[in-house]
Amino acid sequence: KFCGAAGTTTGSQHLLEVNGTRILLDCGLYQGHRSESYEVNCCFPHFDPGEIDIVVLSHAHIDHSGNLPNLCKQGFSGNIYATFATRDLCQIMLADSAHIQEQDTEWLNKDRAKDGLPPVQPLYLEEDAERCLRQFISIGYERPMPLCDGVTLTFFDAGHILGAAQVLLEIIDKEDGNKKKRFLFSGDIGRGRNEILRDPVPVPDVDFVLMESTYGGREHELPTGATDAFGEILAEALKRGGKVMIPAFAVERTQQLLYVLNQLFHTGKLRRVPVYVDSPLAVNATEIFRIHPECFNETVYRFLFDENDPFIFEGLHLVRAVTESKRLNDSTHGPCIIISASGMCEAGRIRHHLKNGLGDPKNTVLFVGYCADNTLGRAIRDGRKTVNIFGKPVQVRANIETIDSFSGHADHSELLDWFGRMTGPKKRTWLVHGESTRSDALRDALTDEFGGAVDVAVLGETVTI
């Protein structure tokens, strides 16, 4: 049953019932406007949390993991299976999400009070996130684990973020004459050729596929030129004598940029300037990256032993304290690079840097990731001359640059390549995690190239395999 991320890219939740056991694949937050998000996330209209037996989590991104504390709070008491790195990232990301839930509820209640409506409670608190973590069981890649009667789970590297997995369920269907069925949930698929991570692993002998379609019908810039393009933009920007402000996702993108900067400085392709990572979540995530070399590609793994730490270098400052963050906005501060969350500029310390730095033509804002419609990041990327930050208009005089080749999601061609490398009959495929136009484009391409039955998932629909 498709319970989320059908016709959209957030709120991943897919319910599988086999041999009387109810298995939930992912339990993500739907992300949209505050009031709409709260209404969608507060209850589970497609199932009773207390009747779910097992959760299998593909990766730590909040649109896949973020409603787990609420699920547990509302009665789920079973095990949550994830990779070791995913569990460690969830420890910091779910706590951070709880903090955001409390802030969002505060804003939402102000609006409700104006309309004469009673206040609502946060979806969950930090203690709920902490309790939820006790239900996690960690499994390594490609190590089969019996889940329940007739079902074995195996994780395969998805190459999307640290710890991201494709979920293979090997099923002996006792309601269908003990037939063996291999069901694969893609999770989110990486591009391959990532600066840090291994490529997605082809999964063998697959019968049924539940597949993401985020970038169906859309191609990215080639990842092979990302480092050089990044270095050239930075070199030109630093010549102006200003700051380079980089809005970046705290998990994966920040660490990717740190590794690339380390390479650029190490090879002399970029002159050394101070680099500040101004995001407590990103700082914590970077520490987790260091303890999970099993997720690294061969190049980074070798660098780890030859050069020590791929994410730490001379001139790097990891900023936790608010006072230190505020000092970065001092007008006497010389040329530097500031990496700060959030990537879409909707929250976090990046908004303070933009408020103070957008008006200076010596400064540069460099976007390295996706910005959704109706976000501050999208407005700046699209060239708006005045933006609203903290309720006040801010003139945009800084230089605005964009690199799209750092994307963590496979594009259209890469999704087709991933599907083609997978072996087995692939009797039926369902597409999720994509806007309808993206899913439709990928469905048409898969059908044309590979044949077989390919359907776009419909929210609330139940199918039998």
Q: Where are each of the predicted segments found?
A:
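Pre-active-site segment of Zn-dependent metallo-hydrolases
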Residues: 6-11, 18-78, 82-136, 189-198, ...
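Metallo-beta-lactamase
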Residues: 97-161, 176, 293-333
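Cap/insert and terminal regions of metallo-dependent hydrolase folds
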Residues: 166, 190-278, 364-369, 386-453
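Acidic/glycine-enriched edge-of-secondary-structure segments
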Residues: 27-31, 53, 180-186, 192, ...
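Active-site neighborhood of phospho(di)ester-bond hydrolases with catalytic His/Asp-centered motifs
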Residues: 25-27, 52-61, 68, 80-83, ...
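Hard-cation-handling environments
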Residues: 233-373, 388
